[in-house]
Amino acid sequence: MATFELIPYRLYLSQSNTWIHRIKAEIKIYIVALLWISIFIFSYFKLCIIALSLIAISFTIRSKQNIIQKHLLQTLLMTFLTTVLSFSVAISYKQYAEQEQSQYLSDSKKYKNSSSYYYIQIANDQRIKRQYLITTLKPSLYFFITIYSIKLVMITTSPEVLVITIYRSRIINKIFKNELLFIFLLSSHIVTSIINRIDKVIQVTSLRGSLNLYNSLTRPLMFSLLIFQVFFLEIIRESKEIAQALYTRNLNQENNNFLKIYTVKSNFSDRLNIIISTLYFIILALA
């Protein structure tokens, strides 16, 4: 079924013909929701497959390859920093687990059966190694899938489209209406203030010597602050673009500066994208 739709003229000029740009914003949001649900369900091996799938999808996009490659490198760098942070946490866990294991095995020596002692030692070693690997890899995969899926949606969907999608949602638009612009700007200001205040508190307490932290915890704390700064700066930049799009939407509504174009409301490719994405996650879940 076809219909006429009022959209801004600048959005009409910025439309692209690549396959991922033609996917509706609602379907992209649905796929991102499936990705976030899979984070809490799938194992780290399946999450690796999802991360590689996201990278493969980004290389199939012909337009804006320089922008996509730049964001991919930024996300990989942030993922590496997350891996370093989780690796330091995993080392602390390993040291603690080894101490607990040595204490437990020393108590187990009292038993006369040596085979049971050997079995306990092997079982604990395997459990520590498996937990060490999961603690190191899973947070990095969580971070990469979450951030890069958002980036792909933001790159391949203009802020105007996201604003129109939000505007079509009666519940969201009824709650926020034009105040959504104020919420985005306020959230950006709050996040920036929190980052600056945390940084100042750490600097002052470190200079005064009142920050009593172990040396093994100081570096992970600084790495986490660096990751949060890079992550929130990206969020702030994207929220400003969405806020500008909201301002443009309100201005276009007041000036009636819209272009009437003939668009298709829904077609077979949209349904096919939903079916393929759902089957992809079902197959991974059952594998």
UniProtKB/Swiss-Prot annotation:
Membrane topology: Multi-pass membrane protein
Protein location: Plastid, Chloroplast membrane
Transmembrane segment boundaries: 32-52, 72-92, 133-153, 175-195, 216-236, 266-286
Superkingdom of source: Eukaryota
The keyword Phosphoprotein is annotated on this UniProt entry: no
Broad class of the protein's primary localization: plastid
GO cellular component terms, semicolon-separated: chloroplast membrane
Family, as annotated: Belongs to the ycf92 family.
Protein name per its UniProtKB record: Uncharacterized protein ycf92
Organism per entry: Pyropia yezoensis
